């Protein structure tokens, strides 16, 4: 079903047995995908520039990352996966197993419609959270501002936070918190891109914009870059994540809860 939903041909596979490695009733499923694109149509940091808009696409839930943390919280609170949780409107197990939203067709359609002049980069928010993944598609010297107050954090994330007594810093460094995909686009087409995503049935909103530090090392409205990573007001500057030296993401504002 996932291959059909994303337009991906399934060209091969195998069922391998590993005696002595896995228990008789255990199984593991793994897959890999390969894509091909013309060099002239590659998206990435070299297309991102000052003034670009940073657009969020809503996640469907936890997606496929952070389950080590989630399992520890479930164990800590002693919750049954079959128990009904009022704030979810369904059982805990059903909420935790909500399928990961697939963005492939939507992202391809946006590039087809707006071209590489309009769509500059995509960032899939996986392990490490929003800022760690977004920073990797930004060029060095560039900062993307992200306003935490621009969306309401889905209930499942606050359940994990409260149940595990996890700080918001720990949460945003581990889980997607409601943002599954980010598009960095030309400001000139931002409103049209937003409309197209929403028309496709995926909630979208502007997270922030792309800027650069001034010659004096300051970011307009936030002060010195060198002092932001330890700002007591909740402002965080994140860069150099996952072994990639690229741009940076400046998180500010407070999360909204439903």
Locate each region found by the language model.
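Acidic, glycine-rich loop-and-beta core segments that form the ion-binding/anion-interacting portion
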Residues: 48-95
């Amino acid at each position: 079903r996932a291959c059909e939903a994303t337009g991906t041909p399934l060209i091969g596979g195998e069922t391998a047995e590993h005696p002595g490695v896995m228990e008789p009733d255990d199984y593991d499923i793994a897959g890999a995908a390969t894509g091909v694109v013309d060099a002239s149509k590659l998206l990435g940091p070299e297309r991102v520039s000052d003034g670009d808009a940073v657009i969020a696409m809503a996640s469907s839930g936890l997606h496929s990352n952070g389950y080590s943390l989630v399992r520890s919280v479930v164990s800590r609170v002693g919750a049954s996966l079959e128990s009904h949780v009022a704030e979810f409107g369904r059982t805990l197990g059903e909420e935790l197993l909500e399928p990961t939203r697939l963005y492939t067709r939507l992202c391809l359609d946006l590039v087809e419609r707006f071209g590489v002049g309009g769509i500059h980069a995509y960032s899939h928010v996986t392990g490490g959270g929003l800022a760690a993944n977004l920073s990797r598609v930004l060029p060095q010297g560039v900062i993307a501002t992200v306003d935490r107050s621009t969306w309401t954090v889905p209930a499942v994330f606050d359940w994990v936070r409260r149940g595990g007594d996890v700080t918001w810093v720990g949460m945003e460094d581990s889980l997607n918190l409601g943002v599954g995909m980010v598009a960095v686009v030309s400001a000139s087409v931002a409103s049209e891109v937003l409309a197209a995503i929403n028309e496709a049935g995926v909630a979208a909103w502007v997270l922030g914009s792309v800027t650069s530090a001034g010659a004096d090392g300051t970011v307009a409205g936030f002060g010195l870059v060198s002092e932001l990573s330890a700002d007591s007001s909740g402002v965080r500057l994140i860069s150099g994540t996952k072994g990639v030296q690229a741009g940076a993401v400046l998180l500010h504002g407070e999360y909204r809860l439903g």
